[in-house]
Regions:
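Topogenic membrane-insertion module of multi-pass membrane proteins
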Residues: 1-30, 119-127, 131-134, 149
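Extended hydrophobic alpha-helices typical of membrane-associated regions
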Residues: 225-287
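Acidic (Asp/Glu-rich) catalytic motifs at the cytosolic membrane interface
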Residues: 37-59, 174-197
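Small-residue-rich segments of transmembrane alpha-helices in multi-pass membrane proteins
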Residues: 3-12, 63, 129-144, 198-202, ...
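Multi-pass membrane catalytic core of lipid/isoprenoid biosynthesis enzymes
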Residues: 58-96, 193-229, 265-274
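Membrane-embedded alpha-helical segments that form the functional core of polytopic membrane enzymes
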Residues: 10, 20-45, 101-112, 155-179
Length: 290
């Protein structure tokens, strides 16, 4: 699950290498650790917030609050992870540029808007766009600025690069969230959580999945076709078999919650493999003379 946390930094590292720049590996290690801690906060706090509304009673067996029955303790742990992650990000920003911390704080704010009271925008079906923004342009821009060599620090936030580099992989991350709703449609609807799958119904939502996969890969391959990226970036194709399995599973069994409870893990495999393939493909390009 934590591949979604580390992907922006891995992509930034690969892109910098494709540009003939040497990423700051110490910064990369700190950024990765901080990102994992912050996603831990997001996941645990979401368990807490969903427990408050009762939506996790049946459909979310992996909820630590549901498993342990210790809501307050999980909330304390979540807040500790948030504090630790932000402290590490502050150190990363101190060693690069202060705006890195601001970008990460925006990502955290988007994460809170998703499930946190009084907003709970995920209950209005807005979780997916929030996810794309956080793991796409904002996290990717933060990683690019944090990992740049001191002699090559950009004067402004590199939004154009962050969008071209982060949009496709972030859409794959958004697909993971989208697929997590399929097996708990009835429970979500009963508790007022109007996820996109609840709004569309499982059949129509399953028909959307191939388009999300295609859009994610298209956004990753378009810069190659425009000769902005090396052809080795097409290595993201290694995620395609997992995507094909996901599409087939949801097409045939979208109405059977028990059969599709693992669909988000297939989406996660697609996200991890396609993103890692893109990062590696970019990173090895100079070695292959591309």
């Amino acid at each position: 699950m934590y591949s979604v946390a580390v992907m922006p930094a891995l992509l930034a590292s690969g892109w910098l290498q494709s540009q003939g720049l040497d990423p700051r590996w110490g910064q990369l290690g700190l950024f990765l650790l901080a990102a994992v801690l912050l996603l831990g906060w997001e996941n645990l706090s979401n368990d807490v917030f969903d427990d408050d509304t009762g939506v996790d009673t049946v459909g979310k067996p992996h909820s630590l609050v549901a498993l342990t029955g210790r809501r307050d303790r999980i909330a304390w742990i979540a807040n500790g992870l948030l504090a630790g992650g932000l402290l590490l990000m502050a150190l990363v920003a101190l060693r690069s540029q202060p705006v890195v911390l601001l970008l990460v704080l925006i990502c955290c704010a988007l994460g809170y808007l998703y499930q946190g009271p009084p907003f709970r925008l995920g209950y209005r079906g807005l979780g997916e766009p929030l996810c794309w923004l956080a793991f796409g342009p904002f996290a990717t821009a933060a990683a690019l600025m944090a990992l740049q060599p001191p002699t090559s620090l950009p004067a402004a936030v590199p939004w154009q690069v962050a969008l071209s580099l982060g949009s496709g992989p972030a859409l794959a991350t958004t697909l993971v969230l989208f697929c997590s709703h399929f097996h708990q449609v009835e429970e979500d609807a009963a508790h007022g959580k109007r996820s996109p799958v609840v709004k569309l119904g499982t059949a129509k939502a399953a028909a959307v999945v191939p388009w999300l996969v295609a859009a994610s890969l298209a956004l990753q391959w378009l810069p190659v076709l425009e000769r902005q990226w090396p052809s080795t970036a097409l290595l993201s194709v290694i995620g395609l078999p997992a995507a094909a399995q996901l599409i087939r599973l949801l097409r045939e069994h979208h109405h059977q919650p028990q059969r599709i409870s693992g669909s988000k893990f297939l989406a996660l495999r697609f996200q991890a493999l396609s993103g890692l393939g893109l990062a590696i493909g970019l990173g090895i390009a100079p070695w292959l003379g591309r």
